Each structure stands twice: as C-alpha cells, then as structure tokens.
A protein has these predicted regions:
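Conserved beta-strand hairpin/beta-sheet module of binuclear metal-dependent hydrolase folds
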Residues: 1-39, 127-147, 161
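Active-site metal-binding loops of divalent metal-dependent hydrolases
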Residues: 10-11, 23, 28-30, 52, ...
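Divalent metal-coordination and catalytic microenvironments
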Residues: 20, 27, 51, 74, ...
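Structural motif
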Residues: 24, 45-48, 113, 140-142, ...
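Active-site metal-binding motif and surrounding structural segment of the metallo-beta-lactamase
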Residues: 32-79
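Metal-dependent catalytic neighborhoods of phosphoester/phosphodiester hydrolases
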Residues: 58-68, 83-88, 226-229
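Metallo-beta-lactamase
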Residues: 77-139
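Cap/insert and terminal regions of metallo-dependent hydrolase folds
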Residues: 155-229
Length: 229
C-alpha cells in the first residue's frame, strides 16, 4: 500500500511515535524500551519533533537514544530551544551538537529527505511536518499533523500519505459535554474541542487535498478520562 515503510509505534495521549522509511522517527513520546522493541533504535537517523507535551517528547527516551546513537539528528522548530534548555539546564551540549533547528515554512534537505514545518493551532506552539522522501519510484510525500484545533492555513495537495489527527466525532463530543454538565462532572472534553481535531475536520482536510493515489491514516483518537484525572 505504501512505497515507504510506515510503522505506527504509538499514537494518542499515552504516547506518540511513528517510524517512516526505516530512518525517520516523528515524535518521541514513548519509553525507550518501546522503540527498542520496535527495532527503531538501531535504525533511526532523524527524529522530527512537533511540540513540548510529554506524550510527544519523552525527554528520558530522547537522551538515551542520543547516548546510544550519537549520529542521530534531532530536528525541531526554534520554539523548542528554550524548552530543551530548561530540561537540560545542567548540560544540554549533547543535544545542541545533534540539533537541526528548522524555521517555520522554510524547506530543507538532508539525505534523501526534503522537509518543512507549518504552524498548527494548539495550546502550545506546534507544527505539522511535511516530509518528502526521494525513492526509486519517485518523490513520496507525507504530512503528519496532530494536536490541532483546525488545519486552517495548511495545504498539502496530492500527497501520498496523510497522517492526520481524528481525535473525536463532533456530535458525540458535544453530547458528552452536555451530559457531564447536567451531572456536574469535570468536563475534560471542553479542552479537547479547543485543542484537537475532529474526524469531520480531518476528513474535510483530506478530501480537499488528497489525489488519486493518496492514502491516509487517522491518528490520536480520543480516550475518555476519569473525573479525577
């Protein structure tokens, strides 16, 4: 189905990590052991990061990867620089040496990959990654976008693979909020509506952009939380 390897190691609030083309890890929000079990640690060359939430960046995992694989490059937007400086205030030199800091909307080339990031709409700065792989069959275009209230301003015409958040069904979510308000429960879903993408919006984006040979995968499905969480 795909011209490149696509391995969804984990997606959702418990952790996000997707391995592409046997070399690219997009987000690193899972334990090191999970990546090791998936065979990623020995193969990964580049790690693309989106935003600071811990289900997308597991700092301990990232540090262990860099310790075990010193040639790995970490690619992330400028706004994560301060986040990493805070995390590794005692010593972030090991990260700086392996960092590739990407400016929003600017295109770069590294190895057989051309890539760019575009802003999304979350409660912290966040981006979607557009990653183009040069393969023997031609250019294979992937867009990865999660944790966003909308896809406004994002265009990805005729991409080969759309990895897009479809966190909830809007009608179901609105009904759930109404029921919780009536019973006085904590409404976690209020935040979800403002920070995550509905299946309806995901479908709209995909259908507006996908071509004849495109494929898509839904990511980051909503998980109901208990009132005390």
């Amino acid at each position: 189905m795909y011209n490149i390897e696509v391995n969804v190691i984990s997606t959702g609030s418990t952790g996000n990590a997707i391995f592409l083309d046997g070399q690219v890890l997009v987000d690193c929000g899972v334990p090191f052991s999970k990546l090791a079990e998936s065979g990623v640690v020995d193969r990964v060359k580049y790690i693309y990061l989106t935003h600071q939430h811990r289900d997308h960046i597991n700092v301990a995992t990232l540090k262990k990867i860099l310790t075990n694989r010193p040639t790995v490059r970490i690619i992330y937007p400028q706004y994560l620089v301060n986040f990493f400086a805070d995390c590794f205030s005692y010593d972030c030199s090991f990260l700086i040496q392996k960092s590739f800091i990407s400016s929003i909307t600017k295109w770069y080339k590294i190895g057989n990959i051309t890539f760019s990031c575009v802003p999304l709409h979350h409660d912290v700065p966040n981006v979607a990654w557009k990653i183009h792989f040069s393969t023997p069959q031609g250019i294979y275009k992937v867009i990865y976008a999660t944790d966003t209230a909308s896809m406004d301003g994002v265009i990805a015409k005729d991409y080969n693979l759309y990895l897009i958040e479809a966190n909830y069904d809007k009608e179901d979510m609105v009904q759930r909020i109404k029921e919780k308000r009536m019973t006085g429960q904590y409404i976690y879903e209020d935040r979800v509506l403002k920070t995550h993408l509905s299946k309806q919006k995901a479908d709209d984006f995909i259908y507006e952009n996908i071509g004849r040979n495109g494929a898509y995968m839904y990511l980051h499905g909503h998980e109901d939380k208990k009132d005390n969480e």
